[in-house]
């Protein structure tokens, strides 16, 4: 599973859901799908896919200012 994060600060692409905090992190099944999404938005310079390893999830949680345990995930497309 892959998330897409901003290269500048590691903050992930999230889906805003009313009443849910933190916002769910959007995920893609493959790196190719994540890269295709980035390219479709013309955001290759700003975004990058990351495999959701334990280390990556720790970094994403830190960027979001929350505990890893409180993170939720939403597959793309939802």
Features from the language model and the residues they span:
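Conserved NAD+-utilizing ADP-ribose enzyme module
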Residues: 1-78
């Amino acid at each position: 599973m892959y998330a897409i994060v901003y290269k500048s600060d590691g903050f992930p692409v999230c889906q805003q859901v009313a009443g849910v905090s933190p916002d769910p992190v959007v995920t893609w099944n493959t790196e190719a799908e994540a890269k295709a999404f980035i390219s479709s938005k013309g955001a290759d310079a700003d975004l990058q896919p990351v495999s959701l390893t334990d280390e990556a999830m720790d970094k994403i949680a830190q960027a979001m200012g929350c505990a890893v345990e409180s993170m939720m995930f939403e597959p793309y497309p939802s």
